[in-house]
Swiss-Prot record:
Membrane spanning stretches: none
Subcellular location: Secreted
Organism listed in the record: Loxosceles hirsuta (Recluse spider)
Tissue specificity note: Expressed by the venom gland.
Name assigned to this protein: Dermonecrotic toxin LhSicTox-alphaIA2aiii
GO cellular component term, pick one: extracellular region
Enzyme class per UniProt: lyase
Active site location: 2, 38
Length: 270
């Protein structure tokens, strides 16, 4: 589910069939995660202005992903944080990672004490901001919770050349837990050339990519094209449309929604 920035939308998208949501994170001048907010412009047909304070959103998300909680949504298993680091200077990336880790540890993971169970993908728009990853991972280790890194994956969302993305991960010291996004706003069309390149890297056996997702997919035809190209996931404003296509004869025996028992970091072998 794309652009889930208000707490009530967590339920809304999960009830439409989403097993994963994407949430925008904006930062203040000191690299603190501040709001879950996208702003104008955004996808056609959507309100761009929904928001929460980031820490409040994390608490709402924790409720939705903690078994036994009255707000628990059992099929919600993955959250992509679309980190709007474009407002920061490059030299603030590491600091943003540190602060993100502390916020998640306290408000989402409940300091490691029966917090939310969803897997988290940190999605970074700029390859130059790769130090955010080390800031994040080092902080979780320093805070005594390296085990939570098992729950965390990474994505560079700038549609950069696949080779350049690989280099950024090398600099960040990341091997594994890598999702590769490709896409564009639903207001515009984008072909599947780079998606196919990413899928080939994933399936090569020696590439850096574990999973590939395509965004924003709102139409049945685009959903079919993406599934045919071999993606692991799609981001959509209409989870019910995706569910309909997955139930079509051509797909219902080939693809299914991932559950909590499926690892988001292990490349699926056909």
């Amino acid at each position: 589910g794309h652009m889930v920035n208000a707490i009530y939308q967590i339920d809304e998208f999960a009830n439409l069939g989403a097993n994963s949501i994407e949430t925008d994170v904006s930062f203040d001048d000191n690299a603190n995660p501040e709001y879950t907010y996208h702003g104008i412009p955004c996808d056609c047909g959507r309100s761009c202005l929904k928001w929460e304070n980031y820490n409040d959103f994390l608490k709402g998300l924790r409720s939705a992903t903690t078994p036994g909680n009255s707000k628990y949504q059992s099929k919600l298993i993955l959250v992509v944080f679309d980190l709007k680091t474009g407002s920061l200077y490059d030299n603030q990336a590491s600091e943003a990672g540190k602060k993100l880790a502390k916020n998640l540890l306290k408000h989402y993971w409940n300091n490691g004490n029966n917090g939310g169970r969803a897997y988290i993908v940190l999605s970074i728009p700029d390859l130059n901001h790769y130090p955010l990853i080390k800031g994040f991972t080092d902080t979780l280790k320093q805070e005594g919770h390296p085990e939570l890194l098992e729950k965390v994956g990474y994505d560079f969302s700038g549609n950069d050349a696949v080779g350049d993305v690989a280099k950024a991960y090398k600099k960040a010291g990341v091997s594994g837990h890598v999702w590769q996004s490709d896409g564009i706003t639903n207001c515009l069309l984008r072909g599947l050339t780079r998606v196919k390149e990413a899928v080939a890297n994933r399936d090569s056996g020696n590439g850096y990519i574990n999973k590939v997702y395509y965004w924003t997919v709102d139409k049945r035809a685009t959903t079919r094209d993406a599934l045919d190209a071999g993606v692991d996931g799609v981001m959509t404003n209409y989870p019910d449309v995706i569910a309909d296509v997955m139930n079509e004869a051509a797909y219902k025996n080939k693809v299914r929604l991932a559950t909590y028992e499926d690892s988001p970091w292990v490349t699926f072998k056909k």
